[in-house]
């Protein structure tokens, strides 16, 4: 190719990365956020193991990154890690884009400008930007991996044939193996690499090292390496072993001295080692976050974590929603990317960028077929193939007017899975801008010199800033602190050495963050209703040693309550007596033996002292009876083992689960965001009143919490489009529930000033509800 010898513009790629990084830093989240953000930041801090597949590459790299004091706040450091990895990906996309444009725009500076326009559009696409300013997921690291392997393939395609060039492919294999230990999204650049290899030098696949590299990479990425340890276990294990031995024999037969063959196998094994070496070693040290407990190098627990068995996904042939609705959800997300905040103009912007992207692909097809097919393979893998593979339920908001909640839906929007597709489409839009710049330059031949003709076409570059201005109001995470504040507020609602039973991700992961990263109220034991259906979470609760409650460093709220003798377990001379009983009386083997479902009688009664529990089990037709889930049985055990020994609380976020399943409403009293369980039926009085919203309320405790402790200003903060993420908006309603309830209490007590103040907080929260934001 005529432009092959032109050196890659690494310096300008660095400039492009720096510009995107500046945008991300300016809109960076100052702390944690909802969903998986808190889990990943906390896991990085304690070198823990987050949810399957464990993401060891992220944990190790982010932990190392977090040791460097880039910022005083640890969460900001990890959020900055997301920003840097995304910006580096933009720099690599600049290199790829510039190389692909060489047959479209022969003039260097217009080409650089068009390549920059593409990466600016890609980097400010709504999902890419939103995920680059907070470490909600591990996908910015995966996107960096995709960009890297594509650039390595492009670079390999321009290199001279020979052993030196072959080493680039082995490097690609290493990167693919390594990034698979972060997330499988990172390997989705492989089809583009395959296009480059088969188009440029198809004979390379017959070299002895190449089949070994491809095969070992395949069995490593898809977690079949352990099959080699027990070849007789089944047909799959036998097949993996036979093919592996055959390829080794073939490589030795062809050239026993071929160093590249050994290098290829070694590269894959070293790259994948974080999965098979690091995970079991670290799990055996029982870090505070140890999801799945994948202890043992060839253990079933490790296999289950790597294969995500916990989630129980159905076969790809068993679609969780019709494929056309799954694609419709993807297209809905695509429509968010280019000007999400400009509601009236968003559709036009989507059409414009769709047109530019297709123009870019067509122009690339005309100028560089190899690159065009690679781009198509990459886009197809990151979009249609990924939609098919992920097999999601109906999107959270797709076809809501038609189906409402009458179809199985995802619990949240899943646009982040497709951020790679949106970034690559932004690059293609940059190619489209280059195509139309070339068209204008060719059309204006009478305008004089070539620089003058290119100058006439430069206004097209302004199209690339549309996503920046169209997305910045909601893609930005600057000033958003609700997740951190909720966690701190909820923990501070719990008495010293209390047990707090929570419901799901958004009311649990922030608590992990608050305890492990901020060091807030580590004396509180956390139990999650959803996670208590797993063995590992019950073991984690059992093993956890309760840190001391430092009364001297407590909030004034708790100092006052301790001084007034209003806290269980008060020790003589002040302070709080630390409980000595284990949270679970059962041993770990006994906890492991708990069945997933336990049969119970309909409305079965259980009485402990003055506490009477009415168990409302779920009727399961297959079992012809009523059953209690493992998590509910574990909850009963927590109550039985700790009632009168440790304060027990249920979070307000649990949707009144203990009321419905155990009939505990007469025993629960709200103290702000948490409801304390009492050992006997509660009697209303001057300080204990009834609210139609949440049942009994401790007025004095809640009054002090909501005005002296809680960060309600963070919730009522005005946002240009309200709370953007509807699925997590229920967290705001929890605050609203408390303040609305207290407004009623104040009104009934004749305190009109506080009633109005609480109403104003509620109204401020209601104004931010998801219905007011874009979807």
What are the language-model segments listed below?
Residues 2-3, 99-104, 117, 133-143, ...:
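ER/secretory pathway lumenal C-terminal domains and tails of membrane proteins involved
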Residues 2-15, 110:
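N-terminal membrane topogenic signal
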Residues 21-31, 384-391:
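Alpha-helical transmembrane segments of multi-pass membrane proteins
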Residues 28-40, 50-62, 76, 290-295, ...:
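Extracytoplasmic catalytic/substrate-binding loops of multi-pass membrane glycan-assembly enzymes
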Residues 48, 80-84, 345-348, 424:
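Hydrophobic alpha-helical transmembrane segments of multi-pass membrane proteins
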Residues 56, 68-91, 95-96, 108, ...:
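Loop-to-helix entry region of an early transmembrane alpha helix in multi-pass inner-membrane enzymes
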Residues 60, 509-513:
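Phosphate- and divalent-cation-binding pockets in alpha/beta enzyme and binding domains
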